[in-house]
Amino acid sequence: MRVLYLLFSFLFIFLMPLPGVFGGISDPVTCLKSGAICHPVFCPRRYKQIGTCGLPGTKCCKKP
């Protein structure tokens, strides 16, 4: 029975979604923690928008 609890906990940890991947980024701290930059108006060339930085018109941009 204890093996089932251990198996369940490992499955829960490995199948848990990663933060910042499935949820939208909406503040500068989360943006910077994900390795991205905050940029006004639009993302620079070769960057992809992955969220916003909290202020209107400010985008969270990351290199793919």
Curated annotation (Swiss-Prot):
One of its GO terms (biological process) is cell chemotaxis. GO terms for molecular function: CCR6 chemokine receptor binding; chemoattractant activity; phosphatidylinositol-4,5-bisphosphate binding. Pfam families: Defensin_beta. Residues 33-48 are annotated as: Phosphatidylinositol 4,5-bisphosphate (PIP2) binding. The keyword Signal applies. It comes from the Eukaryota. GO terms for cellular component: extracellular space; Golgi lumen. Keywords: Antibiotic, Antimicrobial, Defensin, Disulfide bond, Secreted, Signal. Disulfide bonds join C31-C60, C38-C53, C43-C61. It is found in: Secreted. Residues 1-23 form the signal peptide. Exhibits antimicrobial activity against Gram-negative bacteria and Gram-positive bacteria, with highest activity against Gram-negative bacteria. Antimicrobial activity against P.aruginosa seems to be salt-sensitive and is reduced with high salt concentrations greater than 25 mM. Also exhibits antimicrobial activity against the yeast C.albicans. Permeabilizes C.albicans cell membranes via targeting plasma membrane lipid phosphatidylinositol 4,5-bisphosphate (PIP2), thereby leading to cell fragmentation and cell death. Acts as a ligand for C-C chemokine receptor CCR6. Monomer. Homodimer. Belongs to the beta-defensin family. LAP/TAP subfamily. This is Defensin beta 4A. It comes from Pan troglodytes (Chimpanzee). The lineage of its organism: Eukaryota, Metazoa, Chordata, Craniata, Vertebrata. The gene is DEFB4A.
